Curated annotation (Swiss-Prot):
Impact when changing residue 265 to A: Reduced activation of G(q)/G(11) and G(s) G alpha proteins in response to agonist-binding
InterPro entries assigned to the protein according to its UniProt record, in alphabetical order: GPCR_Rhodpsn, GPCR_Rhodpsn_7TM, TAAR, TAAR1, TAAR_fam
Gene: Taar1
Keywords recorded for this protein, A-Z: Cell membrane, Disulfide bond, Endoplasmic reticulum, G-protein coupled receptor, Glycoprotein, Membrane, Receptor, Transducer, Transmembrane, Transmembrane helix
Annotated organism of origin: Mus musculus (Mouse)
Family: Belongs to the G-protein coupled receptor 1 family.
Subcellular location: Endomembrane system; Endoplasmic reticulum membrane; Cell membrane
Name the record gives this protein: Trace amine-associated receptor 1
Length: 332
């Protein structure tokens, strides 16, 4: 790998954008990074601190927040410099570490969403056996799979250069020799990345929420019909409405994920078959649109979960440092 800032004949790469545009991009990306760090840190602190939130499902949310926080802490700052400066300043080894960690954390976040959808499916569709099925051991297995599989896949592919099989020269001429550092895929590895990190988990999410929607809708009609018959309208609906609301909330999270990541993964799988015609700047922009997903998840919690808003207030006011604050009631 050559250092782009040291190669005089391609130094124009760094001046394609004016200082005003670069400053605007730095400001926008810094806001995304800040929102990702602050939002997910509050989720981590809240679930760790408040005993009422120590449920199997919330530990899955906790693990996903850690993934998104690490993405904002370890990956986004270097990606910001690479995107704005159109140059990788940190060397070839760190390029591989950055790329593999980026793919690992992005995929891990997606895996967590898939498992969260399965958890909600069990809660809504089989509530009587939910606690027996989804216990802490089950959640730990989900968390382990969500971290380990993306790690093996990402680091194995990048450090063994399996993603470059058959396109090594093209990668050198278009990326490496220009001092760049961005994910680059052959036709085979592009399809594999699309299937592993997007299509399979995304299909699981869509199928599960399709099932949840119709089953929850049917259960709600059945409960309302029963209550009308016995004259108990408005009663005995709280447990079901609580689970249905949780399912809708996580369904919105899945929708946000699909909107954020779908453009990037479509480009990833199509670009090798189109002869690598997608400009690096567009590819970078789509990657940042995917990063935005990690900043939006805590905002979904804040909008839909009253417990998160109460926890947020206590964290910001410093009330978590008071005695017995961990036993505070967040569910009214």
């Amino acid at each position: 790998m050559h250092l782009c800032h040291a190669i005089t004949n391609i130094s124009h790469r760094n001046s394609d954008w004016s200082r005003e545009v670069q400053a605007s991009l730095y400001s926008l990306m810094s806001l995304i990074i800040l929102a990702t760090l602050v939002g997910n840190l509050i989720v981590i602190i809240s679930i760790s601190h408040f005993k009422q939130l120590h449920t199997p499902t919330n530990w899955l949310l906790h693990s996903m927040a850690i993934v998104d926080f690490l993405l904002g802490c370890l990956i986004m700052p270097c990606s910001m410099v690479r995107t704005v400066e159109r140059c990788w300043y940190f060397g070839e080894i760190l390029c591989k570490v950055h790329t593999s960690t980026d793919i690992m954390l992005s995929s891990a976040s997606i895996f967590h969403l898939a498992f969260i959808s399965i958890d909600r499916y069990c809660a809504v569709c089989d509530p009587l056996r939910y606690k027996a099925k989804i216990n802490i051991s089950t959640i730990l297995v989900m968390i382990l799979v969500s971290w380990s599989l993306p790690a093996v896949y990402a680091f194995g592919m990048i450090f063994l250069e399996l993603n470059l099989k058959g396109v090594e020269e093209l990668y050198r001429s278009q990326v490496s020799d220009l001092g760049g550092c961005s994910p680059f895929f052959s036709k085979v590895s592009g399809v594999l990345a699309f299937m592993t990190s997007f299509y399979i988990p995304g299909s699981v999410m869509l199928f599960v929420y399709y099932r949840i929607y119709f089953i929850a809708k049917g259960q709600a009609r059945s409960i309302n019909r029963t209550n009308v018959q016995v004259g108990l309208e408005g009663k005995s609906q709280a447990p079901q409405s609580k689970e249905t609301k949780a399912a809708k909330t996580l369904g919105i999270m899945v929708g946000v994920f699909l909107v954020c990541w779908c453009p990037f993964f479509l480009c990833t799988v199509l670009d090798p078959f189109l002869g690598y015609v997608i400009p690096p700047s567009l590819n970078d922009a789509l990657y940042w649109f995917g990063y935005l997903n990690s900043a939006l998840n805590p905002m979904v919690y804040a909008f839909f979960y009253p417990w998160f808003r109460r926890a947020l207030k206590m964290v910001l006011l410093g009330k978590i440092f008071q005695k017995d604050s961990s036993r505070s009631k967040l569910f009214l």
